Amino acid sequence: MALNLRKNHPLLKIINDSLIDLPTPSNISIWWNFGSLLGICLVTQIITGLLLAAHYTADTSLAFNSVAHMCRNVQFGWLIRNLHANGASLFFICIYLHIGRGFYYGSYLNKETWNIGVILLLTLMATAFVGYVLPWGQMSFWGATVITNLFSAIPYIGQTLVEWAWGGFSVDNPTLTRFFALHFLLPFVIAGLTLVHLTFLHETGSNNPLGIPSDCDKIPFHPYYSIKDILGFALMLISLATLALFSPNLLGDPENFTPANPLATPPHIKPEWYFLFAYAILRSIPNKLGGVLALAASVLILFLIPLLHTSKQRSMTFRPLSQILFWILVTDLLILTWVGSQPVEHPFIIIGQLASFSYFMIILVLFPIVGALENKLLNL
């Protein structure tokens, strides 16, 4: 009998075991779609980014004009740029929903998968940050100046570190060229880490909404979830196209249409919307080093989440108190995002400080207490 090529060919076998014959829980919901959507985001960003890099010039005197040239004179350059800029926003929407899903359903108990996922988030944030500097507009320049300057808060080595990162005594040409190099490299690092993420995931198999072992009831990934994923792809690509074609500048900062000028500071320096929650936490502490530590902690806290799990149930599906706390945390993050976009004045300062305190309080203190309380209430 002829061998089935799909199951025996060294390369096809890997694809088959990951995307076709992969045993998958029969009850996973639409929330499990976001992993593959992130894969599509990454592919889209790499393709559009490669096309943009072919026309971009990483030089302070030419960068802004090369982007303008791309939008005016390159065939569909405006579309490629808009897809790339808004694709980043969709990437972050998907990754935040993906992390939220993992948090809600206890997927973080697959510790290796979760930790690689957090490293992926950090790499994505670094990629987005260096990418935002490349058009060399006002917000690009001042964003780069403000954020890189934070490293100077590190005791003893801070100033040396910043000047080493800048390649000089301020954000200038060397900074732009190295940021372009990093922005080109990091997406491929993300692709590599994604494979590691999937390798660890396929060691344990997917979690499911009930948070219970599902080995007794698995179904093949294809055709059941491949068709379900295609629906997700279509919805996401339609929303990306809609955003890029109808309101491409909705999420951008108008300040970035002005070429970078080191002599004129914009009235309100703020990052893109997907960093605003962390920016609000940074600003809520009136001390530079303290703010930097809080900023780092706001994301690195994700590494602690598997250690803070006190409940005897994996998922929050049957834990109403934890559910309430989870949605309070989501609301808190939305408040932080809003505060981060506002000027530093009353009442935003105090709102930001309360929201920042609540963020750490909920994750570090309230979730473990409520988890233990629910065990007691349910006599577990």
From Swiss-Prot:
Heme b b566 binds at residues 98, 197. PROSITE patterns: CYTB_CTER, CYTB_NTER. Keywords: Electron transport, Heme, Iron, Membrane, Metal-binding, Mitochondrion, Mitochondrion inner membrane, Respiratory chain, Transmembrane, Transmembrane helix, Transport, Ubiquinone. It is a multi-pass membrane protein. GO terms for molecular function: metal ion binding; ubiquinol-cytochrome-c reductase activity. Its main location: mitochondrion. A ubiquinone binds at residue 202. It is found in: Mitochondrion inner membrane. InterPro entries: Cyt_b/b6_C, Cyt_b/b6_C_sf, Cyt_b/b6_N, Cytb/b6-like_sf, Cytochrome_b, Cytochrome_b_C_euk/bac, Cytochrome_b_N_euk/bac, Di-haem_cyt_TM. The chain crosses the membrane at residues 34-54, 78-99, 114-134, 179-199, 227-247, 289-309, 321-341, 348-368. SUPFAM superfamilies: a domain/subunit of cytochrome bc1 complex (Ubiquinol-cytochrome c reductase), Transmembrane di-heme cytochromes. Binds 2 heme b groups non-covalently. Belongs to the cytochrome b family. The cytochrome bc1 complex contains 11 subunits: 3 respiratory subunits (MT-CYB, CYC1 and UQCRFS1), 2 core proteins (UQCRC1 and UQCRC2) and 6 low-molecular weight proteins (UQCRH/QCR6, UQCRB/QCR7, UQCRQ/QCR8, UQCR10/QCR9, UQCR11/QCR10 and a cleavage product of UQCRFS1). This cytochrome bc1 complex then forms a dimer. Component of the ubiquinol-cytochrome c reductase complex (complex III or cytochrome b-c1 complex) that is part of the mitochondrial respiratory chain. The b-c1 complex mediates electron transfer from ubiquinol to cytochrome c. Contributes to the generation of a proton gradient across the mitochondrial membrane that is then used for ATP synthesis. Heme 1 (or BL or b562) is low-potential and absorbs at about 562 nm, and heme 2 (or BH or b566) is high-potential and absorbs at about 566 nm. This is Cytochrome b. The gene is MT-CYB.
